[in-house]
Amino acid sequence: MCMDRLVESYPTGDPGDACRILGPIAIMQADLEEISEFGLQTSIFGRPTPISRLHHTVSSLHHFESGHWVSTYKSRPAAFFFTSGDFHSDQFNKAIAGRRDFVRSCRRGHAERNYSGFSLADGTIIWTLKYVPLAASRCLIFLRVIRMQKFSDQVKEMPRRERRVLETLLYALPFLLAQNLVPAILILKTKKNAVLRYLWIFWSVFVFYQWLQIPISHGESGTYVAKVGVQLFIVILQGFNLVLINPLDRDELLQTKVTGPRDDLLRQVYKVARLFTYLRGVRTPWQVKGIPSHPAYLELQPKTPISRSAFLVRQAAIVAWLYLYLNCANSLADRNSSPLSKPIYGLGYLRVSREEWRTRIMTSLMFWFAFLRAAVDIDYRTASILSVGVGLDAPEDWPPLFGRANQAYTLRNFWGTYWHQMFRWPFTATSNYLARELMALPRPSLLERYTNIFFVFLVSGVMHVMSDLLMGISMSQSASILFFCSMAVGVMIEDAVQAAWTRVSDSHRPGGASTVDSDGYAVPCWHKLVGFIWVCVWLSLTTPAWLCPLQMSKEKSLFLVNIPELVGTRKAIAITVGGGLLVKYTFRGEL
């Protein structure tokens, strides 16, 4: 049964009526047939997939209670469609009227982003490829139906935005538990050379792959899907580090005091699982470099160790302000009439207008020094409030995530001191293994040093490609690997210039005004000024190519409460500025 017949089978022939009568169901079989005839490829979950791999012949429709519909198939499954929630008639009309647009969008490799009718809450499409057993797909149907029926009464009354976010988080929970708990238990219960440890990698990749198979989530929950995907991917790298190449076991954890002799199994599993979630290794022998110290506001408190109440109050105040800031920034960005036009590479920079250069520079600097920092920091501080508030962690386990912006006067300092170090441990462990163990490069040597740096940024690029796929950006559109590998090139250029300057000048004896950097060395102010200009130029050259696909995805607001809509943009900006000053002078906020 194709969509046209589905609509024509109802008296009015109106797709909106068909939608209201049948409930939220739409079968794009006709579109799939058209794509097959044209010999095109459709992009599923951000990856081009030959249409020949899918079967789309529907044999019957089974009606479940509460308006849930599931389509089943004659033979071993290719795919099934299961949709639930609100599917508005205007979206239904748009889906039918835009069939040709849907087909053309497949040629561009991002059909799932242009077709807004299906999402985690408004409708879920789960595609099961040929080689997946029928039993597995039916179990997935059953679990999905049961879960939706259990929560339908509570969730259906929620606003659409909140419902999408809640459903995404509920869906992610078993994935996160499966990915983090299994390696933690393996470390505690197996020896370093156990065969089970080598089998774990298949399990971890399988869990991540299953997360990739969920539909692209539109609108409010798309970023949450990507964040969960990044966490699942990074556990693979950290597990590769702690389970295989630098293996830990229970005895070593006791010796390093990561776990205690009196800890029960649940507490031990939690402490080991933290090594896969909080990747900076705070207060462990593996603590990464570049972690800022706690702010002076907390260190000057009369209580030692840090007062839990003072920590929670300060974190809550900063989280509230970050929410206000991101809310206003997102609202203003939506009104921007001159977004980045397109990615530019090579000699194309010579043809960029002055106005577009201004846009690119301002966008890049605001992105790195304001918006992205705030977006990452708010998640970290929220997690710290939950962990410290329920007593799982101490305030000392949650030092600031970002360093001071005034230290970002070289690319090395930008990435190693100013920017968060959340992924430094698994990235460097992976790069060290590739450069020193697998390639056996001589150490120390320039070749080993810069190969190692290149691998660190390459792994970072791969991780961000995974995030792009979950955001609906195909691999061909993603510029993540190009952007992050360009940082390795920038570091090489920077090191070469610094080495040349050292040879022609007595730079270790600066004259005039100077400041002291994080390593205790005096740095002339003009060196910092030149360095800041260099960092800004390199970021402005490289960042827009990475941001353009993200900007084109046109994701909706992430915020459950939109402050500018409630009080007006001007009042929201005034509240944000006033709140920022209050946080700065009351809690000694640091930038």
From Swiss-Prot:
Question: What pathway does the annotation place this protein in?
Answer: Secondary metabolite biosynthesis; terpenoid biosynthesis
One Pfam annotation, family name? Answer: MBOAT_2
List the membrane topology term(s): Multi-pass membrane protein
- Please state where this protein is localized: Membrane
Is Membrane a UniProt keyword of this protein? Answer: yes
Phenotype on deletion? Impairs the production of the acetylated sartorypyrones A and G, but accumulates the unacetylated sartorypyrones D and F, respectively.
Superkingdom of the organism of origin: Eukaryota
* Keyword terms, alphabetized: Glycoprotein, Membrane, Transferase, Transmembrane, Transmembrane helix
Listed under catalytic activity are: sartorypyrone F + acetyl-CoA = sartorypyrone G + CoA; sartorypyrone D + acetyl-CoA = sartorypyrone A + CoA
Output one GO MF annotation: O-acyltransferase activity
Key word Transcription regulation present in the record?
no
Q: Which GO terms describe its cellular component?
A: membrane
What does the entry give for GO biological process? lipid metabolic process
| Spans traversing the lipid bilayer | 123-143, 168-188, 199-219, 228-248, 309-329, 383-403, 453-473, 481-501, 529-549
* Function as written in the Swiss-Prot or TrEMBL entry: Acetyltransferase; part of the gene cluster that mediates the biosynthesis of meroterpenoids called sartorypyrones. SpyB catalyzes the last step of the pathway and is responsible for the acetylation of sartorypyrones D and F to produce sartorypyrones A and G, respectively. The biosynthesis of sartorypyrones begins with the production of triacetic acid lactone (TAL) by the NR-PKS spyA using one molecule of acetyl-CoA and two molecules of malonyl-CoA.
Regarding protein family, the annotation reads: Belongs to the wax synthase family.
The entry's protein name is Acetyltransferase spyB
Which gene does this sequence derive from? spyB
